[in-house]
Amino acid sequence: MSLRPSTKTEIRRIRYKVSVDAEEGRRRREDFLVEIRKSKRNENLMKKRRVKVLPPDYKLISNDPFESLLEIANMITGVFSDDPSLQLEYTTRFRVVLSFDRSPPTDNVIKSGVVPRFVEFLKKDDNPKLQFEAAWALTNIASGASEHTKVVIDHGVVPLFVQLLASPDDDVREQAIWGLGNVAGDSIQCRDFVLNSGAFIPLLHQLNNHATLSILRNATWTLSNFFRGKPSPPFDLVKHVLPVLKRLVYSDDEQVLIDACWALSNLSDASNENIQSVIEAGVVPRLVELLQHASPVVLVPALRCIGNIVSGNSQQTHCVINCGVLPVLADLLTQNHMRGIRREACWTISNITAGLEEQIQSVIDANLIPSLVNLAQHAEFDIKKEAIWAISNASVGGSPNQIKYLVEQNCIKALCDILVCPDLRIILVSLGGLEMILIAGEVDKNLRDVNCYSQMIEDAEGLEKIENLQHHGNNEIYEKAVKILQTYGLVEEDGRLVEEEDEGGDGCSHPEFQFDFSR
């Protein structure tokens, strides 16, 4: 005999489970975020090497090994000369070597012993050209591997770069900004070292209305590196930077827009306190506008930031909805956008459907559910997963009428189809969604005491899939599958369906639409 809970018990259980699973659903999917953060994006590099195109006839080092050794020895001698003109000439030569776009000989330059000399040149306030060339060389060393960045830090370069932010020479200031960005982009520890060296406020001063476009671009990029990674920098820094970022997201320059949006994305990928500060800064309406930007490299960080904000509390999510984000997200799902954009749009919607019934209704009213179901059935697997999250979250937190609407949009078929995927977590997410649909069916049984949704799961070939999961190697999946089969009237002790059709039919009043189960 099947175990079947009473209606009152199930109503209480629905309310309890919604409160628990909504929080689970609202969590950022760390596996997903780590995956997209690891992907290389040219517009969001943590380090940048400054290169300069040389004339075709420029000859730096001979191809002959013996002559090459002599030339390198001459370069070292020139750098350590007391003649300022030779210092500048040969520091420039080393800088050019370090500016090679591919495989610069950074290790050999470090081993040559010239780094301490470059550090000395940073202090030559009376020779800004030499300061600039030395700063450029050190910036490119810091753009290498972590051990190269460590060499720069260990030689005391960071405090000197901070001092150079006050230089009257634009080129020197810009190069110091770039160097600090490379050091901060290496790791959380390096980022914190730069911040603890007093770089933050002087950097903000570079982002004034009189800055050159080149300085504005580099300072915005460095600022985005200051807020990259976890744990986040101290909250006091957030309060200082938001007014600046609010101005930058209205820039006409695409590169400034990109890095300002990444900075906001990094800021919002933290506590609800950070998210609230971003909202109070008044940037959300602009971020929603940028979701319609023609350039994907602007759209992506703006979308990431919106997704982070709606992963906050319900009030914060509501603020984004009120700014008109849902129709824009609908376009991102249906227009011919990049795969990553559709995936992150689904992720963003999944954070909204993890909220209140009112917010789920907003998603329904924006006609997003049909698009989500379509993606869950036909898109690439990484998009399917996020669409399933969105659908499952809606079923977990939705009212019986909302769940009925989800069923009418063929969500049962989508949730059942994903049960054969290799992703353990998404199998559990789908089972959780199906369980909540079955709970709603228990509350809304018809006069013949039949849970119509259980029959729909069988029609969608879900019963067989759930039965197969009883043999799954993952214990949590096994237990969930057994629980669903036993608790919601899908099996008897002999394994047969309790609510299978008899000669008089199943007693369910099916919707007028037709399911397409042949796909």
Curated annotation (Swiss-Prot):
Gene3D superfamilies: Importin-alpha, importin-beta-binding domain, Leucine-rich Repeat Variant. The keyword Transport applies. GO terms for cellular component: cytoplasm; nuclear envelope. The keyword Iron does not apply. ARM repeats lie at residues 103-143, 146-185, 188-228, 230-269, 272-311, 314-354, 357-396, 400-439. One of its GO terms (molecular function) is nuclear import signal receptor activity. Residues 1-58 form the IBB domain. Binds to conventional NLS motifs and mediates nuclear protein import across the nuclear envelope. Belongs to the importin alpha family. Forms a complex with importin subunit beta-1. This is Importin subunit alpha-5. It comes from Arabidopsis thaliana (Mouse-ear cress).
